[in-house]
């Protein structure tokens, strides 16, 4: 299983560095390959890691194209998301049930305490899908959707609900996806969301593990 993300420069702030390094350490225990869009960072480097030089806020289409090339399940995850080993089993169960895609709400934690993490919003920082479904995303996602824009997840949820409604799973109950409580947010606010047939179908999957 592959993970694809876009990281911020660790020099941006100590908080950004801490959160992304913590996430990267958790990914090494779960994923076979780790692919970052952005300049190389020594502290995010391991034998599993590759970097693709990219502009800030890379297009979702570019990341989906990369996800489509692995011949396996690939996950798009925000760079500060900690994952548990349970994600391996959750995605395996999705596959066994004929699933093609999955998402999860995030459990917010403070300091290093994952045990007491709680769902505090409906933010989505994780999507997993088969490589062939990512290929469809790459062809259809509008070019204005980029990492850092709060509506790209709306589009992607709607797309999966539309093209794979019986193969799209909510794995929230498996408690695999953790998000650190933090400030210092950086968003591409200048991008205007434009509704289409997919954004109008946004919603969590009907199927749940």
Task: Give a label for each model feature.
Residues 1-5, 27, 33-36:
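Hydrophobic targeting segments
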Residues 67, 81-158:
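Conserved catalytic core of nucleotide-sugar-dependent glycosyltransferases
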Residues 31, 70-71, 98-99, 164:
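Short, well-ordered alpha-helix to beta-strand connector turns
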Residues 7-16, 36-76, 82-86:
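Active-site-proximal specificity loops/subdomain of glycosyltransferases
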């Amino acid at each position: 299983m592959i993970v694809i993300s876009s990281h911020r420069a660790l020099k941006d702030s100590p908080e950004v560095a801490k959160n992304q390094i913590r996430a990267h350490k958790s990914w090494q225990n779960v994923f076979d390959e780790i692919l970052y869009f952005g300049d190389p960072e020594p502290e995010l480097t391991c034998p599993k890691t590759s970097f693709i030089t990219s502009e800030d806020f890379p297009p979702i289409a570019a990341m989906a194209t990369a996800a489509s090339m692995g011949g396996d399940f690939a996950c798009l995850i925000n760079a500060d998301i900690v994952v548990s080993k349970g994600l391996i089993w959750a995605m395996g169960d999705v596959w066994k049930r004929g699933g093609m895609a999955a998402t999860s709400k995030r459990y917010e934690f403070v300091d290093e305490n994952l045990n007491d993490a709680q769902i505090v919003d409906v933010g989505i920082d994780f999507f997993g899908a088969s490589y062939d479904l990512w290929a469809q995303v790459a062809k259809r996602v509008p070019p204005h959707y980029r990492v850092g824009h709060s509506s790209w997840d709306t589009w992607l949820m709607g797309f999966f609900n539309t093209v794979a409604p019986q193969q799209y799973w909510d794995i929230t109950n498996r408690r695999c996806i953790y998000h650190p409580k933090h400030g210092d947010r950086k968003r591409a606010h200048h991008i205007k969301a434009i509704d289409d047939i997919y954004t109008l179908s946004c919603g969590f999957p009907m199927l749940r593990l």
